[in-house]
């Protein structure tokens, strides 16, 4: 099977790279083993929230310049501030084209409300997520009786520290009794599947209406809208006060919806999606990838002109750790960090952990290195790349997006007009 590009990994980085390649008119295939980290994500993306010295970033352009001085090995520092902001703006357009309605812009982070009622900086957030500062003063956090993945009382107490009068209430929804027999089934994703039935929407509206008549704002757990935001918009037009949603413990409905929107758009535009498959081998010679072998296709190899590794970090097995070493499992690529095991972590759990910065070495074009030599037609993107701590710096989503679009641009330039 011949493709212009084979992308290993179907998470945020892989999908954005595939969407960008579609726009360039290149034929690509994504090999996805299963659920990506987006299924466990709030669907809010961060670009750059903090610097290595601990300073908060309020102006991203200025923050990128300071980052280049403090952490020159960061992917942003290597690409340059101008390119990062350009790719971020392009990402916003790609997400909008997929039907993902987001709020925020690249140059200035906003503060979103977390499930615990705290404030966290972000670059983009789904439009139903509550942002600070708050225009409303009398807020009601609405939980669902028996639903343990959202604690309205904790969120209300935290919001109260920001000068908001916040009440916590739980509503009874008998329409969800079908899920209550098994506590493991009473999760946000399963509730969302039940509420996909439009015949049940009036019952939810009836439960929320008395609360909406008494408060300036309702905040619910994001437990509906798995495929789209129709129910959210339906409620918005019928309740007398605004409604906002907060992500729950994983699996996350907003994250699952964002993944589905990107995946559907990729396929709609002509991309090929190999679900439930896994790359077991990549054949290469003299620095060029020749074939990609997958578990499900056996002896039938994919033969792409270019290959992109978007296989993630430890969470997605893009990196694998043994008792005394870390390796990239498909090709055994060179890693940016090779610290002895006793230096992998800090005893203080809340400080930046060295293992978070582990990842593959790449050159300026994001081509990974094997034995000190970069590949000619292989690129690495997203959290597989080393040199940064996404949690400490608040840059995980941004690195995925920026490196994905940078790799797509390099592939387009190298592909030229060849068939």
Swiss-Prot record:
Pathway per the UniProt entry: Polyol metabolism; glycerol degradation via glycerol kinase pathway; glycerone phosphate from sn-glycerol 3-phosphate (anaerobic route): step 1/1
Stored InterPro entries: FAD-dep_OxRdtase_2_FAD-bd, FAD/NAD-bd_sf, G3P_DH_GlpB_su
Highest taxon of the lineage: Bacteria
Keywords linked to the UniProt accession: Flavoprotein, FMN, Oxidoreductase
Gene Ontology CC entries for this record: glycerol-3-phosphate dehydrogenase (FAD) complex
Gene3D superfamilies linked to this entry: D-Amino Acid Oxidase, subunit A, domain 2, FAD/NAD(P)-binding domain
EC number: 1.1.5.3
Catalysed conversion reaction: a quinone + sn-glycerol 3-phosphate = dihydroxyacetone phosphate + a quinol
Necessary cofactors: FMN
Catalytic EC class: oxidoreductase
A GO molecular-function annotation: glycerol-3-phosphate dehydrogenase (quinone) activity
Biological processes, Gene Ontology terms: glycerol catabolic process
A Pfam family hit: FAD_binding_2
Signal peptide feature range: none
Recorded family membership: Belongs to the anaerobic G-3-P dehydrogenase subunit B family.
Subunit: Composed of a catalytic GlpA/B dimer and of membrane bound GlpC.
The protein's role, per its UniProt record: Conversion of glycerol 3-phosphate to dihydroxyacetone. Uses fumarate or nitrate as electron acceptor.
NCBIfam families in the record: glycerol3P_GlpB, PRK05329.1-1, PRK05329.1-2, PRK05329.1-3
Protein name per Swiss-Prot or TrEMBL: Anaerobic glycerol-3-phosphate dehydrogenase subunit B
Organism: Klebsiella pneumoniae (strain 342)
Taxon lineage: Bacteria, Pseudomonadati, Pseudomonadota, Gammaproteobacteria, Enterobacterales
């Amino acid at each position: 099977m011949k493709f212009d590009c084979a992308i290993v990994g179907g998470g945020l980085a892989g999908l954005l790279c595939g969407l960008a390649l579609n726009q360039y008119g290149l034929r690509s295939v994504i090999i996805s083993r299963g659920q990506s980290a987006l299924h466990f994500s709030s669907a809010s993306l961060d670009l750059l929230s903090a610097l290595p010295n601990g300073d908060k970033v309020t102006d991203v352009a200025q923050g990128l310049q300071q980052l280049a001085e403090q952490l020159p090995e960061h992917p942003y520092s290597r690409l340059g501030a101008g390119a990062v902001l350009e790719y971020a703006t392009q990402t916003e357009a790609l997400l909008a084209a997929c039907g993902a309605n987001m709020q925020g812009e690249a140059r200035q982070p906003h503060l979103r409300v977390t499930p615990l009622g705290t404030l966290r900086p972000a670059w983009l957030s789904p439009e139903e997520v509550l942002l600070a500062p708050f225009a409303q003063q009398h807020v009601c956090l609405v939980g669902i009786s028996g639903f343990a993945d959202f604690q309205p009382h904790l969120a209300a107490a935290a919001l109260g520290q920001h000068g908001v009068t916040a009440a916590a209430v739980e509503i009874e929804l008998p329409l969800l009794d079908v899920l209550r027999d098994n506590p493991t089934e009473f999760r946000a994703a399963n509730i969302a599947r039940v509420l996909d039935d439009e015949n049940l929407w009036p019952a939810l509206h009836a439960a929320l209406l008395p609360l909406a008549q008494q408060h300036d704002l309702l905040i619910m757990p994001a437990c509906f809208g798995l495929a789209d935001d129709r129910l959210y918009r339906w409620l918005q037009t019928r309740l007398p006060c605004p409604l906002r949603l907060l992500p729950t413990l994983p699996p996350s409905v907003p994250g699952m919806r964002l993944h589905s929107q990107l995946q559907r758009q990729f396929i709609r535009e002509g991309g090929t999606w190999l679900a439930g498959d896994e790359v077991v081998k990549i054949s290469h010679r003299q620095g060029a990838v020749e074939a990609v072998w997958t578990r499900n296709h056996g002896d039938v190899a994919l033969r792409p002109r270019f290959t992109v590794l978007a296989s993630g970090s430890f969470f997605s097995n893009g990196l694998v750790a043994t008792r005394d070493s870390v390796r990239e499992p498909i090709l055994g690529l060179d890693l940016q960090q090779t610290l002895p095991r006793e230096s992998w972590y800090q005893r203080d759990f809340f400080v930046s952990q060295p293992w978070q910065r582990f990842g593959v070495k790449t050159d300026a074009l994001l081509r990974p290195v094997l034995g000190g030599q970069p590949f000619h037609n292989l690129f690495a993107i997203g959290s597989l790349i080393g040199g940064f701590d996404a949690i400490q710096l608040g840059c995980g989503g941004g690195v995925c997006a920026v490196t994905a679009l940078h790799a797509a641009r390099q592939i387009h330039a190298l592909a030229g007009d060849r068939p």
